[in-house]
Amino acid sequence: MIWHVQNENFILDSTSIFMKAFHLLLFNGSFIFPECILIFGLILLLMFDSTSVQKDRPWFYFISSTCLVISITALLFRWREEPIISFSGNFQTNNFNEIFQFLILLCSTLCIPLSVEYIECTEMAITEFLLFVLTATLGGMFLCGANDLITIFVAPECFSLCSYLLSGYTERDLRSNGASLQYLLMGGAGSSILVHGFSWLYGSSGGEIELQEIVNGLINTQMYNSPGISLALISITVGLGFKLSPAPFHQWTPDVYEGSLLHFVAFHSITSKVAASASATRILEFSLYFSSNEWHLLLEILAILSMILGNLLAITQTSMKRMLAYSSIGQIGYVIIGIIVGDSNDGYASMITYMLFYISMNLGTFACIVLFGLRTGTDNIRDYAGLYTKDPFLALSLALCLLSLGGLPPLAGFFGKLYLFWCGWQAGLYFLVSIGLLTSVLSIYYYLKIIKLLMTGRNQEITPYVRNYRRSPLRSNNSIELSMTVCVIASTIPGISMNPILAIAQDTLF
Protein backbone atom coordinates (compact mmCIF):
# COMPACT_ATOMS: atom_id res chain seq x y z
CA MET A 1 0.00 0.00 0.00
CA ILE A 2 2.82 2.42 0.93
CA TRP A 3 4.66 1.54 -2.29
CA HIS A 4 1.47 2.21 -4.28
CA VAL A 5 1.04 5.68 -2.71
CA GLN A 6 4.71 6.53 -3.28
CA ASN A 7 4.44 5.41 -6.90
CA GLU A 8 1.38 7.62 -7.43
CA ASN A 9 3.19 10.60 -5.85
CA PHE A 10 6.19 10.01 -8.11
CA ILE A 11 3.95 9.94 -11.20
CA LEU A 12 2.18 13.14 -10.11
CA ASP A 13 5.49 14.91 -9.42
CA SER A 14 6.94 13.79 -12.75
CA THR A 15 3.82 14.94 -14.59
CA SER A 16 3.94 18.31 -12.82
CA ILE A 17 7.60 18.82 -13.75
CA PHE A 18 6.92 17.81 -17.36
CA MET A 19 3.96 20.21 -17.62
CA LYS A 20 6.03 23.07 -16.20
CA ALA A 21 8.83 22.35 -18.68
CA PHE A 22 6.33 22.15 -21.55
CA HIS A 23 4.74 25.43 -20.44
CA LEU A 24 8.15 27.15 -20.35
CA LEU A 25 9.08 25.84 -23.79
CA LEU A 26 5.69 26.75 -25.25
CA PHE A 27 5.76 30.36 -24.10
CA ASN A 28 9.52 30.97 -24.26
CA GLY A 29 10.55 28.75 -27.17
CA SER A 30 10.55 31.63 -29.64
CA PHE A 31 13.32 33.31 -27.65
CA ILE A 32 15.65 30.37 -28.34
CA PHE A 33 14.52 29.75 -31.92
CA PRO A 34 18.11 29.65 -33.34
CA GLU A 35 19.04 27.07 -30.71
CA CYS A 36 15.89 25.06 -31.47
CA ILE A 37 16.95 24.88 -35.12
CA LEU A 38 20.22 23.23 -34.08
CA ILE A 39 18.34 20.80 -31.81
CA PHE A 40 16.08 19.91 -34.75
CA GLY A 41 19.21 19.40 -36.88
CA LEU A 42 20.66 17.03 -34.28
CA ILE A 43 17.47 14.95 -34.23
CA LEU A 44 17.36 14.93 -38.04
CA LEU A 45 20.98 13.73 -38.23
CA LEU A 46 20.26 10.85 -35.85
CA MET A 47 17.14 9.83 -37.76
CA PHE A 48 18.88 10.08 -41.12
CA ASP A 49 21.87 8.08 -39.86
CA SER A 50 19.66 5.18 -38.78
CA THR A 51 18.08 4.86 -42.23
CA SER A 52 20.79 5.97 -44.67
CA VAL A 53 23.50 4.11 -46.56
CA GLN A 54 27.14 4.98 -47.18
CA LYS A 55 26.50 6.83 -50.44
CA ASP A 56 24.19 9.30 -48.64
CA ARG A 57 27.04 10.80 -46.59
CA PRO A 58 27.00 14.17 -48.43
CA TRP A 59 23.52 14.70 -47.03
CA PHE A 60 24.95 14.81 -43.50
CA TYR A 61 27.09 17.82 -44.43
CA PHE A 62 24.12 19.42 -46.14
CA ILE A 63 21.82 18.99 -43.12
CA SER A 64 24.43 20.35 -40.69
CA SER A 65 25.39 23.33 -42.84
CA THR A 66 21.76 24.16 -43.63
CA CYS A 67 20.79 24.17 -39.95
CA LEU A 68 23.70 26.47 -39.13
CA VAL A 69 22.83 28.87 -41.96
CA ILE A 70 19.13 28.95 -40.97
CA SER A 71 20.13 29.60 -37.37
CA ILE A 72 22.32 32.52 -38.49
CA THR A 73 19.40 33.87 -40.54
CA ALA A 74 17.08 33.64 -37.52
CA LEU A 75 19.60 35.63 -35.47
CA LEU A 76 19.84 38.32 -38.14
CA PHE A 77 16.05 38.71 -38.29
CA ARG A 78 16.01 39.16 -34.51
CA TRP A 79 18.65 41.90 -34.58
CA ARG A 80 17.90 45.15 -32.70
CA GLU A 81 14.89 43.73 -30.88
CA GLU A 82 14.31 44.78 -27.28
CA PRO A 83 16.30 42.77 -24.67
CA ILE A 84 14.22 39.94 -23.22
CA ILE A 85 14.79 37.71 -20.19
CA SER A 86 13.04 34.35 -20.56
CA PHE A 87 12.83 30.90 -18.94
CA SER A 88 12.23 32.38 -15.47
CA GLY A 89 15.35 34.52 -15.66
CA ASN A 90 17.71 31.80 -16.88
CA PHE A 91 18.25 33.14 -20.40
CA GLN A 92 18.70 36.63 -21.79
CA THR A 93 18.31 37.75 -25.39
CA ASN A 94 19.96 41.00 -26.48
CA ASN A 95 22.26 42.29 -29.22
CA PHE A 96 25.38 41.75 -27.15
CA ASN A 97 24.67 38.04 -26.63
CA GLU A 98 23.49 37.57 -30.20
CA ILE A 99 26.67 38.91 -31.78
CA PHE A 100 28.69 36.29 -29.88
CA GLN A 101 26.21 33.60 -30.94
CA PHE A 102 26.59 34.79 -34.52
CA LEU A 103 30.39 34.47 -34.28
CA ILE A 104 30.11 30.90 -32.98
CA LEU A 105 27.65 29.92 -35.72
CA LEU A 106 29.81 31.55 -38.38
CA CYS A 107 32.88 29.67 -37.19
CA SER A 108 31.01 26.33 -37.14
CA THR A 109 29.63 26.93 -40.64
CA LEU A 110 33.09 27.61 -42.05
CA CYS A 111 34.72 24.71 -40.16
CA ILE A 112 32.48 21.91 -41.44
CA PRO A 113 33.85 22.06 -45.03
CA LEU A 114 37.38 21.67 -43.64
CA SER A 115 36.54 18.19 -42.35
CA VAL A 116 35.04 16.72 -45.53
CA GLU A 117 38.12 15.36 -47.27
CA TYR A 118 39.91 14.10 -44.17
CA ILE A 119 36.89 12.12 -43.00
CA GLU A 120 36.34 10.72 -46.51
CA CYS A 121 39.98 9.62 -46.77
CA THR A 122 40.13 8.02 -43.32
CA GLU A 123 36.57 6.61 -43.47
CA MET A 124 35.86 7.91 -39.99
CA ALA A 125 32.34 8.14 -38.56
CA ILE A 126 30.86 11.31 -40.03
CA THR A 127 27.60 11.39 -38.05
CA GLU A 128 29.27 11.41 -34.65
CA PHE A 129 31.68 14.15 -35.72
CA LEU A 130 28.88 16.42 -36.94
CA LEU A 131 26.76 15.65 -33.87
CA PHE A 132 29.62 16.69 -31.59
CA VAL A 133 30.22 19.89 -33.58
CA LEU A 134 26.54 20.90 -33.54
CA THR A 135 26.17 20.04 -29.84
CA ALA A 136 29.28 22.03 -28.96
CA THR A 137 27.90 24.94 -30.99
CA LEU A 138 24.60 24.63 -29.13
CA GLY A 139 26.40 24.68 -25.77
CA GLY A 140 28.36 27.76 -26.80
CA MET A 141 25.18 29.56 -27.88
CA PHE A 142 23.41 28.81 -24.59
CA LEU A 143 26.48 30.02 -22.71
CA CYS A 144 26.38 33.36 -24.56
CA GLY A 145 22.78 33.93 -23.44
CA ALA A 146 23.05 32.42 -19.95
CA ASN A 147 21.75 34.69 -17.20
CA ASP A 148 22.20 32.56 -14.09
CA LEU A 149 25.02 30.61 -12.46
CA ILE A 150 23.54 27.16 -13.16
CA THR A 151 23.17 27.76 -16.90
CA ILE A 152 26.63 29.37 -17.02
CA PHE A 153 28.05 26.16 -15.54
CA VAL A 154 25.99 23.60 -17.49
CA ALA A 155 26.29 25.23 -20.95
CA PRO A 156 30.12 25.19 -21.13
CA GLU A 157 30.11 21.59 -19.91
CA CYS A 158 27.95 20.72 -22.92
CA PHE A 159 30.57 22.43 -25.08
CA SER A 160 33.53 20.91 -23.22
CA LEU A 161 32.31 17.30 -23.23
CA CYS A 162 31.97 17.38 -27.01
CA SER A 163 35.40 19.01 -27.28
CA TYR A 164 36.98 16.24 -25.17
CA LEU A 165 35.52 13.64 -27.53
CA LEU A 166 36.53 15.54 -30.67
CA SER A 167 40.11 16.01 -29.46
CA GLY A 168 40.44 12.23 -29.15
CA TYR A 169 38.46 11.40 -32.27
CA THR A 170 41.31 9.47 -33.93
CA GLU A 171 41.28 6.70 -31.34
CA ARG A 172 44.22 4.81 -32.87
CA ASP A 173 46.52 7.81 -32.58
CA LEU A 174 48.38 7.85 -29.24
CA ARG A 175 48.93 11.61 -29.44
CA SER A 176 45.20 12.13 -29.92
CA ASN A 177 44.40 9.94 -26.92
CA GLY A 178 46.91 11.82 -24.81
CA ALA A 179 45.52 15.17 -25.93
CA SER A 180 41.98 14.10 -25.08
CA LEU A 181 42.96 12.85 -21.61
CA GLN A 182 44.99 15.97 -20.83
CA TYR A 183 42.19 18.23 -22.01
CA LEU A 184 39.66 16.26 -19.94
CA LEU A 185 41.74 16.55 -16.76
CA MET A 186 42.49 20.25 -17.20
CA GLY A 187 38.90 21.02 -18.20
CA GLY A 188 37.56 19.12 -15.21
CA ALA A 189 39.90 21.00 -12.87
CA GLY A 190 38.84 24.34 -14.38
CA SER A 191 35.14 23.51 -14.05
CA SER A 192 35.58 22.45 -10.41
CA ILE A 193 37.33 25.70 -9.52
CA LEU A 194 34.72 27.72 -11.43
CA VAL A 195 31.77 26.14 -9.62
CA HIS A 196 33.61 26.66 -6.31
CA GLY A 197 33.67 30.39 -7.08
CA PHE A 198 29.99 30.27 -7.98
CA SER A 199 29.20 28.69 -4.60
CA TRP A 200 30.82 31.64 -2.81
CA LEU A 201 28.78 34.07 -4.91
CA TYR A 202 25.61 32.10 -4.21
CA GLY A 203 26.19 32.06 -0.46
CA SER A 204 27.36 35.66 -0.16
CA SER A 205 24.35 37.01 -2.08
CA GLY A 206 21.83 35.21 0.12
CA GLY A 207 21.04 32.35 -2.26
CA GLU A 208 20.65 34.24 -5.56
CA ILE A 209 21.66 32.66 -8.88
CA GLU A 210 20.62 35.28 -11.46
CA LEU A 211 23.45 37.66 -12.35
CA GLN A 212 21.59 40.90 -11.66
CA GLU A 213 19.95 39.53 -8.53
CA ILE A 214 23.37 38.56 -7.18
CA VAL A 215 24.34 42.25 -7.18
CA ASN A 216 21.13 43.15 -5.32
CA GLY A 217 21.69 40.29 -2.91
CA LEU A 218 25.23 41.44 -2.11
CA ILE A 219 23.89 44.93 -1.38
CA ASN A 220 21.16 43.55 0.90
CA THR A 221 23.53 41.25 2.81
CA GLN A 222 26.35 43.85 2.89
CA MET A 223 28.76 41.11 1.76
CA TYR A 224 30.24 42.85 -1.30
CA ASN A 225 33.54 43.55 0.51
CA SER A 226 33.74 40.23 2.34
CA PRO A 227 36.59 37.68 2.02
CA GLY A 228 34.09 35.34 0.36
CA ILE A 229 33.80 37.67 -2.63
CA SER A 230 37.60 37.76 -2.90
CA LEU A 231 37.66 33.95 -2.95
CA ALA A 232 34.87 33.94 -5.54
CA LEU A 233 36.79 36.41 -7.71
CA ILE A 234 39.99 34.35 -7.61
CA SER A 235 38.18 31.04 -8.25
CA ILE A 236 36.10 32.42 -11.12
CA THR A 237 39.15 34.04 -12.73
CA VAL A 238 41.11 30.78 -12.52
CA GLY A 239 38.15 28.74 -13.80
CA LEU A 240 37.62 31.07 -16.74
CA GLY A 241 41.38 31.05 -17.30
CA PHE A 242 41.29 27.33 -18.05
CA LYS A 243 38.55 27.98 -20.63
CA LEU A 244 40.21 30.99 -22.30
CA SER A 245 43.74 29.49 -21.96
CA PRO A 246 45.71 32.68 -21.29
CA ALA A 247 49.09 32.32 -19.61
CA PRO A 248 49.72 30.81 -17.08
CA PHE A 249 46.72 28.50 -17.74
CA HIS A 250 47.94 27.66 -21.24
CA GLN A 251 49.97 24.48 -20.63
CA TRP A 252 47.37 22.14 -22.11
CA THR A 253 46.81 24.17 -25.27
CA PRO A 254 49.90 23.27 -27.40
CA ASP A 255 49.65 19.55 -26.57
CA VAL A 256 45.93 19.39 -27.37
CA TYR A 257 46.44 21.33 -30.60
CA GLU A 258 49.27 19.04 -31.68
CA GLY A 259 47.45 15.79 -30.89
CA SER A 260 44.03 16.68 -32.29
CA LEU A 261 42.59 16.77 -35.79
CA LEU A 262 43.30 20.03 -37.61
CA HIS A 263 39.66 20.80 -38.36
CA PHE A 264 38.78 20.32 -34.68
CA VAL A 265 41.62 22.63 -33.67
CA ALA A 266 40.33 25.23 -36.15
CA PHE A 267 36.85 24.95 -34.64
CA HIS A 268 37.93 24.88 -31.00
CA SER A 269 40.57 27.61 -31.19
CA ILE A 270 37.86 30.19 -31.91
CA THR A 271 34.52 28.98 -30.54
CA SER A 272 35.91 28.28 -27.06
CA LYS A 273 37.39 31.76 -26.82
CA VAL A 274 34.27 33.48 -28.17
CA ALA A 275 31.93 31.68 -25.75
CA ALA A 276 34.25 32.07 -22.75
CA SER A 277 34.77 35.78 -23.51
CA ALA A 278 31.02 36.38 -23.60
CA SER A 279 30.58 34.53 -20.31
CA ALA A 280 33.53 36.29 -18.64
CA THR A 281 32.23 39.69 -19.69
CA ARG A 282 28.81 39.12 -18.16
CA ILE A 283 30.03 37.51 -14.92
CA LEU A 284 32.70 40.10 -14.22
CA GLU A 285 30.63 43.10 -15.32
CA PHE A 286 27.52 42.23 -13.32
CA SER A 287 28.11 39.74 -10.50
CA LEU A 288 31.53 41.11 -9.49
CA TYR A 289 30.63 44.75 -10.07
CA PHE A 290 31.87 45.79 -6.61
CA SER A 291 35.29 44.17 -7.18
CA SER A 292 35.98 45.83 -10.54
CA ASN A 293 39.41 47.17 -9.52
CA GLU A 294 40.51 43.73 -8.33
CA TRP A 295 39.41 41.81 -11.42
CA HIS A 296 40.84 44.50 -13.68
CA LEU A 297 44.23 43.94 -12.02
CA LEU A 298 43.97 40.15 -12.36
CA LEU A 299 43.04 40.39 -16.04
CA GLU A 300 45.85 42.87 -16.72
CA ILE A 301 48.35 40.36 -15.32
CA LEU A 302 46.86 37.57 -17.46
CA ALA A 303 46.93 39.78 -20.57
CA ILE A 304 50.59 40.78 -20.08
CA LEU A 305 51.70 37.19 -19.44
CA SER A 306 49.70 35.91 -22.43
CA MET A 307 51.02 38.49 -24.89
CA ILE A 308 54.65 38.04 -23.82
CA LEU A 309 54.84 34.27 -23.27
CA GLY A 310 52.55 33.36 -26.19
CA ASN A 311 54.57 35.29 -28.76
CA LEU A 312 58.00 34.43 -27.32
CA LEU A 313 57.28 30.69 -27.23
CA ALA A 314 55.76 30.76 -30.73
CA ILE A 315 59.14 31.81 -32.17
CA THR A 316 60.81 28.57 -31.06
CA GLN A 317 58.23 26.15 -32.50
CA THR A 318 58.90 23.83 -35.43
CA SER A 319 55.32 22.50 -35.73
CA MET A 320 52.71 24.68 -37.40
CA LYS A 321 50.03 23.49 -34.96
CA ARG A 322 52.10 24.35 -31.89
CA MET A 323 53.07 27.71 -33.36
CA LEU A 324 49.40 28.59 -33.85
CA ALA A 325 48.63 27.34 -30.34
CA TYR A 326 51.11 29.76 -28.79
CA SER A 327 49.98 32.45 -31.20
CA SER A 328 46.39 32.00 -29.99
CA ILE A 329 47.59 32.48 -26.41
CA GLY A 330 49.03 35.83 -27.46
CA GLN A 331 45.82 36.70 -29.31
CA ILE A 332 43.66 36.12 -26.23
CA GLY A 333 45.88 38.62 -24.44
CA TYR A 334 44.77 41.25 -26.94
CA VAL A 335 41.11 40.28 -26.46
CA ILE A 336 41.44 40.66 -22.68
CA ILE A 337 42.33 44.34 -23.24
CA GLY A 338 38.82 44.85 -24.65
CA ILE A 339 37.26 43.06 -21.65
CA ILE A 340 39.18 45.31 -19.23
CA VAL A 341 38.22 48.51 -21.07
CA GLY A 342 34.57 47.47 -20.88
CA ASP A 343 31.56 49.42 -22.03
CA SER A 344 32.89 52.90 -21.26
CA ASN A 345 35.40 53.40 -24.11
CA ASP A 346 34.03 51.03 -26.76
CA GLY A 347 36.09 48.20 -25.28
CA TYR A 348 33.45 45.57 -25.98
CA ALA A 349 32.93 46.90 -29.51
CA SER A 350 36.67 46.69 -30.20
CA MET A 351 36.79 43.16 -28.75
CA ILE A 352 33.89 42.00 -30.94
CA THR A 353 35.43 43.63 -34.04
CA TYR A 354 38.78 41.96 -33.42
CA MET A 355 37.15 38.58 -32.81
CA LEU A 356 35.27 38.85 -36.10
CA PHE A 357 38.55 39.47 -37.93
CA TYR A 358 40.29 36.77 -35.87
CA ILE A 359 37.79 34.18 -37.11
CA SER A 360 38.65 34.89 -40.75
CA MET A 361 42.42 35.13 -40.13
CA ASN A 362 42.66 32.01 -38.01
CA LEU A 363 40.29 29.83 -40.04
CA GLY A 364 41.99 30.92 -43.26
CA THR A 365 45.35 29.87 -41.83
CA PHE A 366 43.99 26.52 -40.68
CA ALA A 367 42.31 25.91 -44.06
CA CYS A 368 45.68 26.38 -45.76
CA ILE A 369 47.35 24.02 -43.28
CA VAL A 370 44.61 21.41 -43.75
CA LEU A 371 45.12 21.48 -47.53
CA PHE A 372 48.89 21.27 -47.25
CA GLY A 373 48.69 18.49 -44.66
CA LEU A 374 46.32 16.40 -46.77
CA ARG A 375 48.59 16.72 -49.82
CA THR A 376 51.91 16.13 -48.04
CA GLY A 377 51.18 14.52 -44.66
CA THR A 378 53.48 16.85 -42.73
CA ASP A 379 53.01 19.63 -40.19
CA ASN A 380 56.61 20.78 -39.90
CA ILE A 381 57.20 24.46 -40.66
CA ARG A 382 60.45 23.62 -42.43
CA ASP A 383 58.57 21.47 -44.95
CA TYR A 384 56.65 24.49 -46.28
CA ALA A 385 59.83 25.75 -48.00
CA GLY A 386 59.27 26.50 -51.68
CA LEU A 387 55.49 25.96 -51.66
CA TYR A 388 55.03 29.02 -53.88
CA THR A 389 56.79 27.22 -56.75
CA LYS A 390 54.24 24.37 -56.64
CA ASP A 391 51.01 26.03 -55.51
CA PRO A 392 51.11 29.85 -55.70
CA PHE A 393 47.45 30.25 -54.70
CA LEU A 394 47.84 28.26 -51.48
CA ALA A 395 51.13 29.98 -50.60
CA LEU A 396 49.70 33.47 -51.17
CA SER A 397 46.56 32.65 -49.19
CA LEU A 398 48.60 31.42 -46.24
CA ALA A 399 50.89 34.46 -46.45
CA LEU A 400 47.94 36.89 -46.42
CA CYS A 401 46.32 35.21 -43.41
CA LEU A 402 49.60 35.19 -41.48
CA LEU A 403 50.27 38.85 -42.28
CA SER A 404 46.76 39.71 -41.12
CA LEU A 405 47.33 37.79 -37.87
CA GLY A 406 50.51 39.80 -37.41
CA GLY A 407 48.60 43.04 -37.92
CA LEU A 408 50.25 44.50 -41.01
CA PRO A 409 48.34 47.21 -42.94
CA PRO A 410 46.13 47.37 -44.92
CA LEU A 411 44.82 43.95 -43.85
CA ALA A 412 41.90 43.43 -41.47
CA GLY A 413 44.10 42.35 -38.57
CA PHE A 414 45.85 45.73 -38.55
CA PHE A 415 42.62 47.71 -38.24
CA GLY A 416 41.24 45.31 -35.63
CA LYS A 417 44.33 45.70 -33.45
CA LEU A 418 44.47 49.45 -34.08
CA TYR A 419 40.90 49.91 -32.84
CA LEU A 420 41.49 47.61 -29.86
CA PHE A 421 44.71 49.35 -28.82
CA TRP A 422 43.20 52.81 -29.37
CA CYS A 423 40.30 51.98 -27.03
CA GLY A 424 42.78 50.67 -24.46
CA TRP A 425 44.88 53.83 -24.75
CA GLN A 426 41.78 56.02 -24.34
CA ALA A 427 40.93 54.08 -21.17
CA GLY A 428 44.36 54.77 -19.70
CA LEU A 429 45.86 51.29 -20.17
CA TYR A 430 49.13 52.73 -21.47
CA PHE A 431 51.42 49.97 -20.22
CA LEU A 432 49.12 47.21 -21.44
CA VAL A 433 48.80 48.75 -24.91
CA SER A 434 52.58 49.28 -25.11
CA ILE A 435 53.13 45.58 -24.36
CA GLY A 436 50.53 44.74 -27.01
CA LEU A 437 52.30 46.84 -29.64
CA LEU A 438 55.72 45.35 -28.86
CA THR A 439 54.45 41.76 -28.90
CA SER A 440 52.58 42.42 -32.17
CA VAL A 441 55.89 43.45 -33.75
CA LEU A 442 57.42 40.29 -32.28
CA SER A 443 54.68 38.14 -33.82
CA ILE A 444 55.36 39.65 -37.25
CA TYR A 445 58.88 38.21 -37.02
CA TYR A 446 57.84 34.56 -36.80
CA TYR A 447 55.04 35.01 -39.32
CA LEU A 448 57.48 36.56 -41.81
CA LYS A 449 59.89 33.70 -41.17
CA ILE A 450 57.24 31.26 -42.43
CA ILE A 451 56.38 33.50 -45.40
CA LYS A 452 60.06 33.65 -46.35
CA LEU A 453 60.12 29.84 -46.42
CA LEU A 454 56.98 29.75 -48.57
CA MET A 455 58.48 32.06 -51.18
CA THR A 456 61.97 30.55 -51.39
CA GLY A 457 62.98 29.13 -54.75
CA ARG A 458 66.34 27.62 -53.85
CA ASN A 459 66.34 23.89 -54.53
CA GLN A 460 68.63 23.05 -51.62
CA GLU A 461 66.01 24.39 -49.16
CA ILE A 462 63.02 22.62 -50.71
CA THR A 463 62.14 19.40 -48.88
CA PRO A 464 60.87 16.22 -50.59
CA TYR A 465 57.35 17.02 -49.37
CA VAL A 466 57.10 20.09 -51.59
CA ARG A 467 59.24 18.59 -54.36
CA ASN A 468 56.70 15.75 -54.69
CA TYR A 469 53.71 18.02 -54.02
CA ARG A 470 50.59 17.13 -56.01
CA ARG A 471 47.14 18.65 -56.03
CA SER A 472 44.51 16.18 -54.88
CA PRO A 473 41.93 15.27 -57.54
CA LEU A 474 39.15 14.77 -54.99
CA ARG A 475 36.10 16.95 -55.58
CA SER A 476 35.82 17.71 -51.85
CA ASN A 477 38.88 19.90 -52.20
CA ASN A 478 36.51 22.53 -53.55
CA SER A 479 34.81 22.91 -50.15
CA ILE A 480 38.11 23.45 -48.33
CA GLU A 481 39.34 25.90 -50.95
CA LEU A 482 35.99 27.71 -50.81
CA SER A 483 36.31 28.19 -47.03
CA MET A 484 39.91 29.25 -47.49
CA THR A 485 39.02 31.79 -50.19
CA VAL A 486 36.18 33.27 -48.12
CA CYS A 487 38.46 33.62 -45.09
CA VAL A 488 41.31 35.17 -47.12
CA ILE A 489 38.94 37.75 -48.63
CA ALA A 490 37.47 38.47 -45.18
CA SER A 491 41.00 38.92 -43.80
CA THR A 492 41.80 41.49 -46.49
CA ILE A 493 38.73 43.47 -47.57
CA PRO A 494 37.19 44.55 -44.20
CA GLY A 495 40.24 46.69 -43.50
CA ILE A 496 39.10 49.01 -46.28
CA SER A 497 35.48 49.24 -45.04
CA MET A 498 35.68 49.41 -41.25
CA ASN A 499 32.87 51.88 -40.53
CA PRO A 500 29.89 49.50 -41.09
CA ILE A 501 31.59 46.81 -39.00
CA LEU A 502 32.27 49.25 -36.16
CA ALA A 503 28.68 50.50 -36.28
CA ILE A 504 27.35 46.94 -35.92
CA ALA A 505 29.74 46.21 -33.04
CA GLN A 506 28.74 49.41 -31.23
CA ASP A 507 25.06 48.47 -31.60
CA THR A 508 25.67 45.44 -29.39
CA LEU A 509 26.62 47.41 -26.27
CA PHE A 510 24.51 47.06 -23.15
UniProtKB/Swiss-Prot annotation:
Keywords: Chloroplast, Membrane, NAD, NADP, Plastid, Plastoquinone, Quinone, Thylakoid, Translocase, Transmembrane, Transmembrane helix, Transport. The chain crosses the membrane at residues 24-44, 59-79, 99-119, 124-144, 149-169, 183-203, 229-249, 295-315, 323-343, 354-374, 395-415, 418-438. One of its GO terms (molecular function) is quinone binding. It catalyses: a plastoquinone + NADH + (n+1) H(+)(in) = a plastoquinol + NAD(+) + n H(+)(out); a plastoquinone + NADPH + (n+1) H(+)(in) = a plastoquinol + NADP(+) + n H(+)(out). One of its GO terms (biological process) is photosynthesis, light reaction. Its EC number is 7.1.1.-. The keyword Translocase applies. This is NAD(P)H-quinone oxidoreductase subunit 2 A, chloroplastic. It comes from Triticum aestivum. The gene is ndhB1.
